[in-house]
Amino acid sequence: MSKESRIFIEISENIIDLNYWYKIVSDDSSGATSSFLGTTRNEFKGKSVERLEYETYEPMAIKEIEKICKTILNGFENDIKKIGIVHRIGNVPVGESSILIVISSGHRKSSLEAVHYAIDTIKSTVPIWKKEFYTDGSENQWKGNCESCHFNNNNHPH
């Protein structure tokens, strides 16, 4: 099986089907399947959120996600079996999912660490932008990802 046949990527406006993606990465040689499911929460910095809207330059986003997947397949003690990543674009209401990362591996440590690496790297390198829409009608702004802002207490506006 080539590395490319172990990578499954989709950018879609459709609701994410968890069972479908778990089946895609299912592998009889796997002892673990780990995942991350990102959902739209109902609040941001005290404002009530109605929905998020995502946009991307799809060819570049897919290319960047492929790079991340290949890095994962070449690392983690060559224990990764398959990787599935789907990111929604368009409107994603509160409670619905915007991204799913599912990774199967021989052992749990590899898939858990790979999922963590994947989401952090996707959020910092892949050209996908979101706009929050608030229930009070206040100004909506496009936001890029700035992973370190939330963890280092930097006072960025997003």
Swiss-Prot record:
Give the catalytic activity.
2 [molybdopterin-synthase sulfur-carrier protein]-C-terminal-Gly-aminoethanethioate + cyclic pyranopterin phosphate + H2O = molybdopterin + 2 [molybdopterin-synthase sulfur-carrier protein]-C-terminal Gly-Gly + 2 H(+)
Which GO molecular function terms does the record list?
molybdopterin synthase activity
Location in the cell: Cytoplasm
According to the record, the signal peptide region is none
CDD domains hit by this protein: MoaE
Any one Gene Ontology BP term: Mo-molybdopterin cofactor biosynthetic process
Q: Which GO terms describe its cellular component?
A: cytosol; molybdopterin synthase complex
Q: Give its E.C. classification number.
A: 2.8.1.12
Give the matching Gene3D superfamilies.
Molybdopterin biosynthesis MoaE subunit (3.90.1170.40)
Per its UniProt entry, what is the enzyme's top EC class, as one word?
Answer: transferase
- Pfam families given in the database record: MoaE (PF02391)
Annotated residues that bind substrate are located at 107-108, 123, 130-132
So which domain of life are we looking at? Eukaryota
Major location (coarse): cytoplasm
Q: What does the function comment of this entry state? A: Catalytic subunit of the molybdopterin synthase complex, a complex that catalyzes the conversion of precursor Z into molybdopterin. Acts by mediating the incorporation of 2 sulfur atoms from thiocarboxylated mocs2s into precursor Z to generate a dithiolene group.
Q: Which family does it belong to?
A: Belongs to the MoaE family. MOCS2B subfamily.
The record describes its quaternary structure and partners as: Heterotetramer; composed of 2 small (mocs2s) and 2 large (mocs2l) subunits.
What is the protein name for this chain?
Answer: Molybdopterin synthase catalytic subunit
| Recorded name of the encoding gene | mocs2l
